[in-house]
Amino acid sequence: MITQRQNDILNLIVELFTQTHEPVGSKALQRTIDSSSATIRNDMAKLEKLGLLEKAHTSSGRMPSPAGFKYFVEHSLRLDSIDEQDIYHVIKAFDFEAFKLEDMLQKASHILSEMTGYTSVILDVEPARQRLTGFDVVQLSNHDALAVMTLDESKPVTVQFAIPRNFLTRDLIAFKAIVEERLLDGSVMDIHYKLRTEIPQIVQKYFVTTDNVLQLFDYVFSELFLETVFVAGKVNSLTYSDLSTYQFLDNEQQVAISLRQSLKEGEMASVQVADSQEAALADVSVLTHKFLIPYRGFGLLSLIGPIDMDYRRSVSLVNIIGKVLAAKLGDYYRYLNSNHYEVH
């Protein structure tokens, strides 16, 4: 455990270093720390011995080590902090008209990436927690059709498929009827379970040959089990990490799994400093924050960047963007649920 003065010195070194990326000497600290230069140097030496500070090769100053950044995050960083100076810029960046949910989530991801210079990832509500609230089949021709699904009464998902060769029109009607009777209004988690248990038995009552029918069920509903992921600033990862992080960001489903695992049960926010179980994120910092998607649940807003990032500003931007995004989504869903009259 370090003393209060040593804690203040570490915090100030972190703050100054993240702003200038230059080693910090005792003279710079004296402007804020009410102690002699010798006392400050002695405390800096103790912090270095504890592994919280590192010597710079080209200067007599010190800079935070990865362990020092981690100590700062765990003991001094407020995860709910907001810098009022950033509020106006974020609100201004959100001044655009969105025509669908994906537009807002993608825009929010770009805003966070552009304002930090790092990599931003936004996830929609976890698939397992969404509900199938609408289903229809539209026959496009004699050989193909379109499954139109609605999640949470607002999110459309469409899947085009080739009609099995032995299918007649009445078979498509039966397919739709099974979905409406057994799967509609259920959660995606329930659907995944029923496709392996109930549906194979039900299909036998309606169809003579069941193999291609079960394959059709799997094909149509497989889309529901995938995370909706919006990545921005992927190229930025090359400035603070190696190629493995850049390549990892291409695997959006694995990215989603790793980011969800960074939050413990019941947590609304977390900061990992070189502490991810994912090898591609082991040498970077990951800020993760839940934000409200009204009427549906929680999305996830994440920022991936260097260990020596400006944590206070990054946390502030994540919090502000999460709040502004939730407000925009609230307006969007209220509009969808309201009576809409066409004006001539």
From Swiss-Prot:
InterPro entries: GAF-like_dom_sf, HrcA, HrcA_C, WH-like_DNA-bd_sf, WH_DNA-bd_sf, WHTH_HrcA_DNA-bd, WHTH_transcript_rep_HrcA_IDD. One of its GO terms (molecular function) is DNA binding. This is Heat-inducible transcription repressor HrcA. Belongs to the HrcA family. Negative regulator of class I heat shock genes (grpE-dnaK-dnaJ and groELS operons). Prevents heat-shock induction of these operons. NCBIfam families: hrcA. Transmembrane segments: none annotated. Gene3D superfamilies: 3.30.450.40, Heat-inducible transcription repressor hrca homolog, domain 3 (3.30.390.60), Winged helix-like DNA-binding domain superfamily/Winged helix DNA-binding domain (1.10.10.10). It comes from Streptococcus agalactiae serotype V (strain ATCC BAA-611 / 2603 V/R). Keywords: Repressor, Stress response, Transcription, Transcription regulation. It comes from the Bacteria. GO terms for biological process: negative regulation of DNA-templated transcription. It holds the Pfam family HrcA_DNA-bdg.
